[in-house]
Amino acid sequence: MISQIDKTELLERFLHYVSFHTQSKPHAKHSPSSVGQMKLAMQLQKELIQLGLENVEVSKYAVVTAFLPANDPNLTKTIGLVAHLDTSPQCSGKNVRPEVIEEYRGGDIALGIGEEFISPVYYSFMQKLVGQTLIVTDGTTLLGADNKAGIAEIMTALSILQKENIPHCNIRVAFTPDEEIGLGIHYFPMEKFSCDWAYTIDGGEVGELEYENFNAATAKVRFFGRNIHTGYAKGKMLNALTLACEFQQVFPVDEVPEKTDGKVGFYHLEDFSGDIEQVELTYLIRDFDEQNFAQRKAFIKNQVEKFNAKKGLKKPIELEIQDSYQNMYDVVKNVPQSIELADRAMKAVGIKPNHKPIRGGTDGAFLASKGLACPNIFTGGYNFHSKHELVSLQGMENTVQVIIEMLKCKDL
């Protein structure tokens, strides 16, 4: 049996990790994209060594890897645990000032001294958290539970395994940079992470077990115009901004993130930048089904061709499509033990597993593309990438319990 988890230690770890400014930079060409990620990587290296792990290394790309050999000769499996160092560039992660709400009583929570607040009127899940200890923001930054809650949970689980000498299988640990911008995982040293399967600890609500994700691509559409003084523009000016606005109208209005859920894909206009002479539109293309995904990419190509033919532009619009990641299910389905073990571990600690698709991606999607099954486990966090982000300390404790239970590798 696992003795009572020291919530104070778990909380202190988390609060320490979120003090590192590790926000990734979206247009970076090299990893890590921010200095703080390397600083956190070095801190974790130090702590992993103190915990007695072996082969603890930090690469020049800020990828942390470590190994803890099994302490029971009958437990021969090797399981990996993965979390990421960076926070989202969509909301400031600098000078995070967490606030701890003990025994949340329900109702609205004021964030800091400003006008920001979170309310169960908008976030119905808060009703489930009454009586729990919540860590929230001060309303000026994100919290960083994505994914520093996962890091704290992995480190706490390792600490308990070592202190209590709990029988466990071989364990590989990795902390990766720049997950939020899809960059750092490309520098992942697969040769130092050989395992039977792995788990990212990067999910949300307690019970979440995810092993299907979007196929993802990014499309960039460029428009070229011709500027001239507006007083003499008739018959001469070509406004790239106007062209871009017209092109945007060809997309299905209901196939967008704010109108879809479950396994329904979408197009998402993520960025619109430029001026009269040149504009670039950036679209996210997402779908769970591989055939539908291909059709979505073909749709954009066809619309670009039609637009060019219709307008007869001297300099036609340009299209660039880059695949980002693929649905991990094609790999995970061949390693059903990875799902069965997580299911069993959750049930063993009194948690009902909630199998759900990820409407996004994780480092596990990339690892799956390399042949390594890597489902995603909950962290106890909510409202990621926003000033309304929060995490439940009891939810984090649940994650630690599940990690330890999985690493016992019972009945495998």
Swiss-Prot record:
> One Gene Ontology cellular component annotation?
cytosol
Name the keywords, alphabetized.
Aminopeptidase, Cytoplasm, Hydrolase, Metal-binding, Metalloprotease, Protease, Zinc
**Active-site residue list:** D86, E179
Q: Where does Zn(2+) 1 bind?
A: H84, D146, D202
Q: What is its main location?
A: cytoplasm
| Record field: catalytic activity | Release of the N-terminal residue from a tripeptide
UniProt-recorded name of the protein: Peptidase T
**Where found?**
Cytoplasm
InterPro entries xref list: ArgE/DapE_CS, Bact_exopeptidase_dim_dom, Peptidase_M20, Peptidase_M20_dimer, Peptidase_M20B
Q: Does the keyword Zinc apply?
A: yes
Family membership noted in the UniProt record? Belongs to the peptidase M20B family.
Task: Provide the GO biological process annotations.
Answer: peptide catabolic process; proteolysis
Taxonomic superkingdom: Bacteria
- Enumerate the residues binding Zn(2+) 2: D146, E180, H385
Q: SUPFAM superfamilies this protein is in?
A: Bacterial exopeptidase dimerisation domain (SSF55031), Zn-dependent exopeptidases (SSF53187)
Tell me which EC number(s) this protein carries.
3.4.11.4
Q: Read off the CDD domains from this record.
A: M20_peptT (cd03892)
Cofactor binding note: Binds 2 Zn(2+) ions per subunit.
Q: What is the lineage of its organism?
A: Bacteria, Pseudomonadati, Pseudomonadota, Gammaproteobacteria, Pasteurellales
**NCBIfam families to which the protein is assigned, alphabetical:** peptidase-T (TIGR01882), PRK05469.1 (NF003976), PRK13381.1 (NF009920)
Q: Which organism is it from?
A: Haemophilus influenzae (strain PittGG)
User: What is the annotated role of this protein in its UniProt record?
Assistant: Cleaves the N-terminal amino acid of tripeptides.
One MF term from GO for this chain? Answer: metallopeptidase activity
Essential cofactor(s): Zn(2+)
